């Protein structure tokens, strides 16, 4: 049975279509990584793969709903998982309610190692995207890799 995780919601200071376009191409993830983290990471439009702490992890786009959500699934990973990125419009024009859902089939050992860290990681992703959209770049992030005006 898969473990379910949901990030907190964050209001990103960009419209849903900007976020959708940013995340719909897996090559953008590679471009946003700091140079020292790019070794062993490859990407094309639909897939991204990396070796992290000796584990090979691959991700592929399962489905795209324009300007609303992107569903990702494992591709050659040590466990099965599914990620949904939500880009919901808010009452304020030009803002997005962003959140992430994750379902992962973790064995007992992985659940003990990763279970508590997954929730924190999902929340950090939301916080970082909110910060970037408001011009506060996390260390190691190159603002030139984002669409024009994204981090301003």
Which residue stretches match the model-derived regions?
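Glycine-rich portal/gate segments that line the openings of hydrophobic small-molecule binding cavities
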Residues: 30-33, 37-78, 150-151
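Generic structural detector for well-ordered beta-strands
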Residues: 9-13, 60, 86
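Conserved short hydrophobic interaction patches
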Residues: 26-32, 121-128, 132, 136
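Intrinsic-disorder/low-complexity, polar/charged segments enriched in Ser/Thr/Lys/Arg/Asp/Glu/Gln
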Residues: 3-9, 47, 56, 69, ...
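Short, highly charged C-terminal tails/helix-capping segments
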Residues: 127-152
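Hydrophobic pocket/interface hotspot
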Residues: 19-23, 29, 48, 61, ...
